[in-house]
Amino acid sequence: EFTEYLTESVEVPSPFDLLEPPTSGGFLKLSKPCCYIFPGGRGDSALFAVNGFNILVDGGSERKSCFWKLVRHLDRIDSILLTHIGADNLPGINGLLQRKIAEQDEEQSQGSTTYSDWMKNLISPELGVVFFNVPDKLKTQESSMRVKRSIEEACLTLQYLTKLGVNPEPLNRVVTATIDPIPLFHKMGVGRLDMYILNPVKDSKEMQFLMQKWAGNSKAKTGIKLPNGKEGEISVPYLTSITALVVWHPANPSEKIVRVLFPGNAPQNKILEGLEKLKHLDFLKYPVPTHKDIAGPLTPPVVKQTKIRQRTDSRESLKSSPKPSAPKPVKKEEPSKRRPPNTQRSRRRL
């Protein structure tokens, strides 16, 4: 009875009411590198875009996608990066996917909805590649997984992607001395966009535990030793969260190289381990790098050179300059015995 009462009294908004279509026509074109940070609620959400390509990182914790007011003006979302399995980043993405499914099922209504309103509902960006590390148990939907909000959201994400015909791509880095970039976009005369994966590591203990043994609980003993020597009891989705460094290389050598780090929910030690593998990259050795600066020789700062020159000059001047001679004593002259003429005049007047 309580369920029937709720179904009669509570109205669930449709995907088109939750994510309204744009009010104006045309698409938004982002020509310069930019990064939009959205109010993700308890989670995060950001969009990084360059001229010709964009990447959406996570979607926030609300079903009403916090990024929708901007994204609905784009003709395409080229890539979506889901850093981890969680209720703080998947609901916003699921809201977008649910709307895309509703667009496929939408038919011209014979009721009050006019043809123009029906066509407006179909205006939304196309979806490109989706990066998402998913355990094998979630794909098979085994009943052994514990019921949890994050697991439910991940299952919904997989169901929606399957209906849309999108296969999520895994993302990790191979154990090597250095990290090779993943080319996301390259256009002659415009630039190149690369992505370096810092975490997780392929075939590591964390990834094997996530893919094979993780039962959906928030914290579990992974058998992995932390830097303090104790066995790690940490959230497995956080331990295997994707951390990516996105780098934009413009074609113009005088333009700035843009570097954006998306840490996800990875622990700090995992992020630092990945950054150690990137120490050989020249564009990380400058605070504001350009390809013109990297091509030139490395020169120390001017301030340090002037200080060194001043010290060497002072030492050489001390060696070359003669020692100052002692001042000669000055003889004191005796006062003269003559009377000043003024005294005589003063006496005569008296």
From Swiss-Prot:
How does the record say this protein sits in the membrane? Peripheral membrane protein
Q: Which GO MF terms does the UniProt record name? A: actin binding; microtubule binding
Q: Does the keyword Cell wall biogenesis/degradation apply?
A: no
Query: What main location does UniProt list?
Result: membrane
The superkingdom listed in its UniProt entry is Eukaryota
- Which Gene Ontology cellular component annotation is one that this UniProt entry carries? endomembrane system
Keyword Membrane on this protein? yes
Q: Where is this region: Disordered?
A: 305-350
**Family, per entry:** To T.californica electromotor neuron-associated protein 1.
PANTHER family per UniProt:
MICROTUBULE-ASSOCIATED PROTEIN, MICROTUBULE-ASSOCIATED PROTEIN 1A
**Name this protein carries in UniProt:** Electromotor neuron-associated protein 2
What is the native source organism of this protein? Tetronarce californica
